[in-house]
Structure formats: structure tokens, C-alpha cells
């Protein structure tokens, strides 16, 4: 673990790009010393940016009635709710359920016959300016961002056992 006092950040939002990138550089430098190798990609936790989650349902009409892998990928990329949240960017889309005709829930829709495919998913959104500013400060350190996560989500996942993650649990982050 590389640690350094954070500067240029207030309530999870960038207030000074150069101060923040300097803090990140020093923390990464210490982590590289401890690890014994160079770091080029990072995962970034977000505490600011007014994150929220929304459960959505997206539908796709299947052209030849047989669901293909490409149909599933198209549905995973589809974000029909984006227009509702103009200043926000989707950082995560976690599938809850796939449904074919007659609202039949299926585990794996690939190869099944249906005219439609529906995906119910939990989507996580964060203010796009917060993402852009954090990404810029990280890129100033010659690093690239692999993925963004919201801190409560990561904290919650880290405290659950496999059964709780699979079956569902309520986590209260105070």
C-alpha cells in the first residue's frame, strides 16, 4: 500500500489538479517501491459526485428469434435511461435478470428462442465532471484508470461473504 496525504481534493471532488496529481504520484511511488514493480493502471474509488443507483429495464427485439451472444452484449451496452441523467455518467451496469417472452426469467439467454430479450439491471451513475477531473489528475501521473467504483459499493462488497453477495444483503454505510 502506498500512502500519502491527499491534497487538492475536498469532499471527494477535485479542487486542485496539480496538488492532487502530486499526492497520487507520491502514493503510487511508495506502492511501487513496496511492490517491486511499476504501476500503469489503477482502479479509482469515488466518494464525491453524488453517486446513485437506479434499477432499469431495457428491451431488445430479436431479429431471427434466436438469441445470440451479440444480442446480449448489445443489451448490456444499451442505456435508455442516459437521457434522464444528462450530467451523469454510468460507471457500472450489473445485470439482475434476463427475461424472454412472457416475462420468463432465464439464467443464460444465449441460444434460446424468443422475439424479445429484456435485461433488468442495477446501474450506478456519478457526476461526469467529477469523473473527468479525477481521470485528468490520474493521467497527469502517467497512469490510466482501469475502472471507477463508488466507495460504499466497494466497502459493502468487501464485508460480505459469498452467500451474501449471491443471495443479496442489505449494507448500511454510515
Can you say where each PLM-predicted feature lies in the sequence?
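Nucleotide/phosphate-binding catalytic cleft detector across ATP-hydrolyzing
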Residues: 2-42, 46-172
Amino acid at each position: 500500500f502506498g500512502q500519502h496525504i491527499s491534497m487538492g481534493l475536498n469532499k471527494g471532488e477535485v479542487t486542485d489538479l496539480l496538488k492532487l496529481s502530486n499526492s497520487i504520484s507520491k502514493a503510487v511511488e511508495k506502492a511501487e517501491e513496496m511492490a517491486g514493480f511499476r504501476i500503469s493502471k489503477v482502479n479509482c474509488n469515488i466518494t464525491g459526485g453524488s453517486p446513485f443507483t437506479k434499477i432499469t429495464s431495457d428491451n431488445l427485439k430479436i431479429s431471427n428469434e434466436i438469441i445470440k451472444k451479440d444480442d446480449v452484449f448489445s443489451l448490456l451496452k444499451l442505456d435508455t435511461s442516459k437521457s434522464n441523467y444528462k450530467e451523469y455518467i454510468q460507471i457500472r451496469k450489473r445485470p439482475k435478470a434476463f427475461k424472454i417472452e412472457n416475462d420468463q426469467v432465464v439464467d443464460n439467454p444465449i441460444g434460446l428462442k424468443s422475439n424479445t430479450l429484456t435485461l433488468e439491471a442495477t446501474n450506478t451513475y456519478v457526476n461526469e465532471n467529477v469523473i473527468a477531473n479525477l481521470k485528468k489528475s490520474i493521467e497527469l501521473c502517467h497512469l490510466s484508470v482501469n475502472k471507477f467504483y463508488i466507495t460504499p459499493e466497494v466497502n459493502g462488497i468487501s464485508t460480505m461473504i459469498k452467500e451474501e453477495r449471491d443471495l443479496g444483503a442489505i449494507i448500511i454505510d454510515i
